[in-house]
Amino acid sequence: TPVEATDYAENVAAYKAQKRPFLSFMSGISAGACIALAFVFYTTTQTASAGAPWGLTKLVGGLVFSLGVIMVVILGSELFTSSTLTLVARVGGKITTTQMIRNWIVVYLGNFVGGLFIAAVIWFGGQTMAANGQWGLTILATAQHKIHHTWFEAFNLGILCNIMVWVAVWMSSSG
């Protein structure tokens, strides 16, 4: 039931927020690496799809990128976007505001380190030169597309992304 799902989410969030910061940081590294690997999958599908219809290309890209969130959930890693669900435990009075914010900061930094690690492995492994350099050009084109959003557009797209991750995590705990 929704009430049981909320109780479960509160307890999981309270557990995450009360974990030792080092464990949250390591879990954050794992999640950051998973999302970075998903971006590798996404980039590969987008690089190889020049002649495919736009909608099909985006569907395949979205499906393979979703593997990142699936890996995070299966591994029990901490992704910043899902860690913001600790707000449920804060509202329920199970954790303090300090515990919640500390968790957010530690997990965010862990995600950054995990993503940076995969980026370094990709760079030093020469993956950017795959498909005669087209793989690396796809990364650059994706980045260029992202920086052309206004601040307001980027903020709202971030909210939409966070909602989608929340729903995915919530659904995984409701089964």
Segments (PLM) and residue ranges:
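Alpha-helical transmembrane segments and their helix-helix packing motifs
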Residues: 1-175
